[in-house]
Amino acid sequence: MIEINVYYKKWYNVIRKPKSFVKNIINTSLIDLNIYEYKPIISIVLANNKLLQQLNYEYRKKNKPTNVLSFPYNKLDKNCYLGEIFISLDVLMNESVDLNIPIEHHTSHMLIHGLLHILDYDHEEPLDQYIMESIEIKLLDKLGIKNPYVSRET
């Protein structure tokens, strides 16, 4: 089950039907990862810079907003409460402009990125980064979204 809290109402001005949008991205990703049948409970909070900065400081001691924060709670199992994903519209909008990509594409990428983190993927080491980015690229491709790392590689 996907629980979505639109904490920051400006999401409604930027993404049409944000709850449906998020559910589609997460459910499609769970299916493509072959874990949909586990029916994990995932909470997603569509937030702003203020909330992400508070959480980033509280949990990571970084006093600045960030695009996505993930909090894994349990290992994947049937009907487990897998974790929470928080994303900041403010950061995503700025990054979308800087990257010259649609906000929907960047939001999809950050949702998938957050999902992979609550599934215990990380990008601290080069091999782990390669694995995580490869999965992100594959899942985004299934959604018709181009590789977000291409511009960094060329």
UniProtKB/Swiss-Prot annotation:
<keyword id="KW-0540">Nuclease</keyword>
<protein>
    <recommendedName>
        <fullName>Endoribonuclease YbeY</fullName>
        <ecNumber>3.1.-.-</ecNumber>
    </recommendedName>
</protein>
<dbReference type="InterPro" id="IPR023091">
    <property type="entry name" value="MetalPrtase_cat_dom_sf_prd"/>
</dbReference>
<keyword id="KW-0255">Endonuclease</keyword>
<dbReference type="GO" id="GO:0008270">
    <property type="term" value="F:zinc ion binding"/>
</dbReference>
<feature type="binding site">
    <location>
        <position position="117"/>
    </location>
    <ligand>
        <name>Zn(2+)</name>
    </ligand>
</feature>
<comment type="similarity">
    <text>Belongs to the endoribonuclease YbeY family.</text>
</comment>
<dbReference type="GO" id="GO:0004222">
    <property type="term" value="F:metalloendopeptidase activity"/>
</dbReference>
<feature type="binding site">
    <location>
        <position position="113"/>
    </location>
    <ligand>
        <name>Zn(2+)</name>
    </ligand>
</feature>
<keyword id="KW-0690">Ribosome biogenesis</keyword>
<comment type="function">
    <text>Single strand-specific metallo-endoribonuclease involved in late-stage 70S ribosome quality control and in maturation of the 3' terminus of the 16S rRNA.</text>
</comment>
<keyword id="KW-0698">rRNA processing</keyword>
<keyword id="KW-0378">Hydrolase</keyword>
<dbReference type="GO" id="GO:0005737">
    <property type="term" value="C:cytoplasm"/>
</dbReference>
<dbReference type="InterPro" id="IPR002036">
    <property type="entry name" value="YbeY"/>
</dbReference>
<keyword id="KW-0862">Zinc</keyword>
<feature type="binding site">
    <location>
        <position position="123"/>
    </location>
    <ligand>
        <name>Zn(2+)</name>
    </ligand>
</feature>
<dbReference type="GO" id="GO:0006364">
    <property type="term" value="P:rRNA processing"/>
</dbReference>
<dbReference type="GO" id="GO:0004521">
    <property type="term" value="F:RNA endonuclease activity"/>
</dbReference>
<keyword id="KW-0479">Metal-binding</keyword>
<dbReference type="Pfam" id="PF02130">
    <property type="entry name" value="YbeY"/>
</dbReference>
<keyword id="KW-0963">Cytoplasm</keyword>
